[in-house]
Amino acid sequence: MDIKSRTPFGIWFVLFLLLVTPFAGLSPFAFDSDESIVELTPQSVGDSVNARAQTTWSGTVSVTSTYTVSVFDELIISPCTNIEMGSGARIYIEGRLTIEGTIACPVTLISSTGSDHDGIQFNSSSNNRGSILNNLSIEDSIYGVTMYGANPIIHNLTILNPDRVGIDMFSSSSPLIYDLVINQAGRVLPFQGDWRYGLGLSIGSGSTPLVDGAIFTDHLTRAINIWGGSGGVLRNLVMSNISGSSWAISAGVWVEDSQPLLLNLSVDRSDHGIVVRHIDDSGYTRAVFRDCTVSNSMYRGVYVDKENHSNYTNYETADFTNLTVRGTGGEGAKTPNIAFAAIDVNSTGAWFENTLVDNSTSTGVRLYYADSSTTFRNLTIRDSGDPGQGPHKAGLAITWIFTSAPVFDGLEISGSVGHGIHSYKAEWQGSDLYLHNNSENGMFLDYSSVQIEGSVLENNSLSGLHMLDNIDTQLTNFTVQYNGFGGTTDEEKAGMFFDRSKTVTHPQLDVECFTCTVTHSAGSGILIRDSADLWLSDIVLAENDPNHAPFDVDNSGLTLGQQGGVINIDGLDIHTERSGASGTPAVNISQAAARIHSLTMSGNHSGIEWDGQNHNDYSSEISNSNFSGTGCVSLTNHLDLSGSGNTVSPSCSGTIQLINSQVNWSALTDLALASTVLQLDSNSDLHLHQPVNVDLNQSYPTIASGATVDVAYDITVWVVNNNTNGIPRANVDVSFSQFEPVMQDLTNTLGYLSLPNFIGQRWTNTGSSSYTVATISCGYDSVSNSTTVTIDQDRFVNCVLPLENQAPFLMWATPVDLGVFISQGPVEFNASDSWDLDDDELTFTWTSDLDGDIVASCTGQGQGNGQGITQQDMTNGVPFTVNTNYLNMGCQLSDGIHVITLEVCDDAGHCVSESRTIELVNQAPTIVFDVTPAMTPWSELVIP
């Protein structure tokens, strides 16, 4: 908008135009009543001129200030018309505008003075009046086309160098726009006093256009700016070089508090590719994108956020399907290497499906204060990350998420300059993850809580998985292989590294790995340091580095008295082949408590080396495991190590060595080719319960003075009467000739008493003791008997008591004591499990303190009725139900509080009775209702 100096002739010419302008409409054509079309060839149009019913422009037309097409009028602009606009001039459309430009001969709207004009404005009165704009070019305007509640149809519109906005929509405008081109919005500005410069297409205040085909090039602020509850459908969009504003975020697409649909979109070389921001909570934001490509953005490819980052009531504000983001912060960007993230989601929710992030100089995807309203499905991140920038080194950076978990379903990350995933203080869920060929760890979880189902982590330079200070983590179906070959420390070389993962015992928040296979690591398969309450199940470690223990634990760094816990292992299969003359253990545990179930080891190794010293004196266990290796088993500093079902395999060529340990094993089986030698130092004791094929004759010379090996067995006592019926609650006393104290107990309801794990023999460095002799005495109702057994194996003792006829045993099932039933409701009476030691017939009497004999209240013959029983059946103990109103048999029980007494007698006259209290009462109704969505714990219904 250059201001040029004027010659005197020019000044007189302008004055002449001002004088003659009021008479411009007095053309002879204006007085021709038969001709409704006025042609202006050329014509100068000033402030006071209004269009008549129908006006046609052609040739060159000059608009010096404003021109208005009244509400019932139409302005037609012919092909090749050149409209010269004065400074600030604007054409107002309140009626109909028809532009008949062609591709070969478009209509042009240009500045005539060197100062920018205000273009065309459609007011709301023009809505539905059929305005059509074909092949129009607008140059050097402040605004190109402005709409207030209008809906023109536009084909092939080109807008060059608009200062503020190319197309500006307000008040629920709904135009149809086809083949739009806007270039250099905001690029030639004399000054800028606010942010609203350099916008290509602005859709606001509830507007809903259809845009099919648009090209935006070289804009200052935004190519597409959507705000104020607007929507519409925009497709086949291309934009490039949207950059440079210091007043507002520059972006190819900006969506604010709106709900548009954008299809087939390409954004190249912009400050930000796509920005979706929620600001006003009185409305909602939901932008939908399909088939979008964003390339060479300077800061972010896609940015989805909320203006108030402390408002955590997130919901899904953006939906992307088939999104590609390439080259963020790369050489193709306006300024390389200053990017924040290729995709950035901050304090809000979004849906991403089929997303590719490629070659970003910062992290590929960053989540900050997101939650379960964010989902990524089929996300691929390649060759991304910013070296030396913490979480931004990673392909995926997830930080500060603890409200609810975002979801990743199908995720592949490769070529990151740092970790594949860096998670810090974050909660999230994932499935079907493939993390490979990353420059550091495949996955680094720092103080995070995750649930991941199905992952492959391979060919990462450092560990496949590094978990630091993790809590409440469940990993399922993991395959971790060929990791750590770029590492220099044992921690970096491990396949999976648990690093201070939950350092204190807690009934919840455990760290778990279920069905995890770790192979071909540069170091250990699983490396654990200072971690407690781990749960490892169905673990396979194979072909990891032979110079490292495949399973390696060291908890020596935990704080005494404050930290510690137990590592839980259920199913650990190890195959390894050592190298060199010195053996490497398959399992190496140092200063840690553990519960190990189902451990198997194969290959060439030295077995198990386990130092059980731990900071809080936790006990340990190893059960159902196979011992093998050249060293077999070495146990040190175990205060209490238990177990059962362990087997010494034929491949065990070493010893079972105990140093300063107390070990109690049941059912240890020795299948070694030669009897396995047990070695105990003077501070150790071994208790073997029911050992199988364990020959201690080979071991006692290696038992140090003061150490013991006890061999123990079980005793089962069955106390019966003359009818071979087990006697419940019979007294059993057992005394032992050595080692064990006297004990006393009662039999169970079937007359059995199990007495497990009593020492039958003790071995020391001098050999074995004699076998222990046990004396068993049983008694009931002043009748007793006794016998003796030698505890050299499991023993079963049948103790017979010749009793007199005994009272029956009353076993009352229903109704339970203090039961409450509805008024006149059914009540079942069942004591059919009652029985008699002498196999006598039993008689049952049911009595209520209110109604008397309950069975006597039953009326009817008991034939063909629903219960199919008689009063005699009830007396014999058959269960029955009152208040059922069967046609042929009715038993009644009135409302009120009843004391029910049951007496059971045998035919010898021995009786036993019991009383219970029940109540039949007319109760208030119970209201049960379901609410969707579910209410909060405070019974609040929150509707999003």
Where does each model-flagged region fall?
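A short, solvent-exposed loop/turn motif at the edges and junctions
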Residues: 672, 691-695, 761-788
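Short, acidic Ser/Thr/Gly-rich low-complexity loop/linker segments typical of extracellular
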Residues: 726, 736-766, 787
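Extracellular beta-sheet/turn segments enriched in Thr/Pro/Gly and aliphatic residues
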Residues: 786-806
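Short, solvent-exposed loop/linker segments at the N-terminal edge
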Residues: 817-825, 933-943
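Acidic, Ser/Thr
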Residues: 830-838, 944
